[in-house]
Amino acid sequence: MTPGALLLLLLGVLGAHLAPGARGSEAEGRLREKLFSGYDSTVRPAREVGDRVWVSIGLTLAQLISLNEKDEEMSTKVYLDLEWTDYRLSWDPEEHEGIDSLRISAESVWLPDVVLLNNNDGNFDVALDINVVVSSDGSMRWQPPGIYRSSCSIQVTYFPFDWQNCTMVFSSYSYDSSEVSLQTGLSPEGQERQEVYIHEGTFIENGQWEIIHKPSRLIQPSVDPRGGGEGRREEVTFYLIIRRKPLFYLVNVIAPCILITLLAIFVFYLPPDAGEKMGLSIFALLTLTVFLLLLADKVPETSLSVPIIIKYLMFTMVLVTFSVILSVVVLNLHHRSPHTHQMPLWVRQIFIHKLPLYLGLKRPKPERDQMQEPPSIAPRDSPGSGWGRGTDEYFIRKPPNDFLFPKPNRFQPELSAPDLRRFIDGPNRAVGLPPELREVVSSISYIARQLQEQEDHDVLKEDWQFVAMVVDRLFLWTFIIFTSVGTLVIFLDATYHLPPADPFP
């Protein structure tokens, strides 16, 4: 190799050793060797045996994934923010070329075993063991991400107009309060933060829930929930007070239920002769049953309370059931006749004469009451008629038109027969009718009686049909009132169920 090539190679080696990056890596390597010489990651970083290690616990919420009401489980994506001081990992930056922080793997340093106590899946670990940031003064900061499934007791009384108070309880699993003391997280200004932190730029909104309050609190239970008798373990509890967005249930459940209830109400507006009263009522009842079965998979299986939407569905189902029963009553009244039922006087007084005035019903007058009386027949006195004196007396003594064919008396139709018999026999038995005329009059009176009976039968049947129509209209207004009042009472109660203005009143 020529002398020039050797000179270039020597200059390259010297430049590599004198480069700033190389010096920095060597300085950091030497610092690591110095810090971890004799370091034990299983030993608590306390200067004295009785000293406590202060651990600050913060929580950054990245996403409220879901709240499973049936399993009473809340899923969240969070970042833990743990800060403590390890005096063994401190140095003077001036002695190490200005290095003021290091990134060290989590397996190499002591970590406070802070876990989620109320987890619902048995997973106590974080999602990723990221590096710990170590500052020159010995302060440690670890921000591992995690997807937690925590238990959340669901209050279903006002579902779907409800709000829930879900908690995430963190504590050191191995150390009690005499060894590790917890406190809530610190803000960038160094002040204690009393709530869950949410970064507005990266937070993912939930389509079903909105966060109302997110406070945190340090709790010192008097009894160790894990059964340890050595000492109390402090807990930091993060609260998420969330309110449900009810639009989905309003559109897909409540609005169809109200429409089905309207169908059940208008069953009573449908004429009984239409033949679809029972079909429409049963259709509404079956539809509500399907809605009830669909909601059964949404709410927790608890006997502590009944959700308000289930109350409304049951209320509607009871009304629809009664509409089916009352439709049977209306159809029974509609198809009654004088041959099968006799109308009591109180039924006639209430449902024909009194109630229609208050229900806006007006029965049309019979046509016979609107017809004018036919003109009376003038007496005949024709000597050539050939009928004789008895015939003349018959026409002279002919009674008014409603005597031979009296106006119907639906209560006492039998009274017309004696009057007609007295007319045929005549007031004076000395005055008689010819046999031919008596036979004609007898036939006419028989036809008149048959027509009268048929007319009375039709009138009484129309009375039953009118009673059925009055009862139908009475049920219509009754159901409108009950449905309106019941719906307002049920849902107005939910409007007053609001999250508290102060999370800790």
From Swiss-Prot:
Residues glycosylated per entry: N165
Subcellular location per the Swiss-Prot or TrEMBL entry: Postsynaptic cell membrane; Cell membrane
Transmembrane segments: 246-270, 278-295, 312-333, 474-492
Membrane topology designation: Multi-pass membrane protein
Key words, A-Z: Cell membrane, Disulfide bond, Glycoprotein, Ion channel, Ion transport, Ligand-gated ion channel, Membrane, Phosphoprotein, Postsynaptic cell membrane, Receptor, Signal, Synapse, Transmembrane, Transmembrane helix, Transport
A molecular-function term among this protein's GO annotations: acetylcholine-gated monoatomic cation-selective channel activity
SUPFAM superfamilies in UniProt: Neurotransmitter-gated ion-channel transmembrane pore, Nicotinic receptor ligand binding domain-like
Positions bearing Phosphotyrosine: Y394
GO biological process per UniProt: acetylcholine receptor signaling pathway; behavioral response to nicotine; chemical synaptic transmission; membrane depolarization; monoatomic cation transport; monoatomic ion transmembrane transport; muscle cell development; muscle contraction
Ranges per topology, Cytoplasmic: 334-473
Disulfide bonds: C152-C166
Span list, region Disordered: 365-391
Pfam families named in the record: Neur_chan_LBD, Neur_chan_memb
Known partners and oligomeric status: Pentamer of two alpha chains, and one each of the beta, delta, and gamma (in immature muscle) or epsilon (in mature muscle) chains. The muscle heteropentamer composed of alpha-1, beta-1, delta, epsilon subunits interacts with the alpha-conotoxin ImII.
Function: After binding acetylcholine, the AChR responds by an extensive change in conformation that affects all subunits and leads to opening of an ion-conducting channel across the plasma membrane.
Name this polypeptide is given: Acetylcholine receptor subunit beta
Species of provenance: Bos taurus
Lineage of origin: Eukaryota, Metazoa, Chordata, Craniata, Vertebrata
Gene: CHRNB1
